[in-house]
Amino acid sequence: MTIKLTSKDDEKRAKIFKALSEVKRIEMIRYLVRHPEHKTCGEVGESLGMDKSNVSYHLKILYEAELIHIYRRGQNKYGQLREDTFNAFLPGFLDSL
């Protein structure tokens, strides 16, 4: 596996590294890796002992870095990993969690 090395992706790389610079966000990614079945954003936060506003804040940053996809089903929001982003920019990272 190779990591993309074009300069046009530098801004995206910076967003990814900034998003992963917070321990809580890494814990959220780890939770989604270990629980691949679809989990609501509330379930993610509850399992990590986070209140709703903190969960929303951290998920937004992960979403903006294209590390997760957030979708709505009914009244619930769900978080799902964007494995394509991890494979392109951080190959092997998800396996290390």
Name each region found by the language model.
Residues 46, 57, 63-64:
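Alpha-helical residues within the helix-turn-helix
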Residues 51, 56-58:
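Short coil turns linking two alpha-helices in DNA-binding domains
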Residues 12-51, 73-84:
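N-terminal helix-turn-helix DNA-binding core of bacterial DNA-binding proteins
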Residues 1-20, 65, 81, 88-93:
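N-terminal leader segment of winged-helix/HTH proteins
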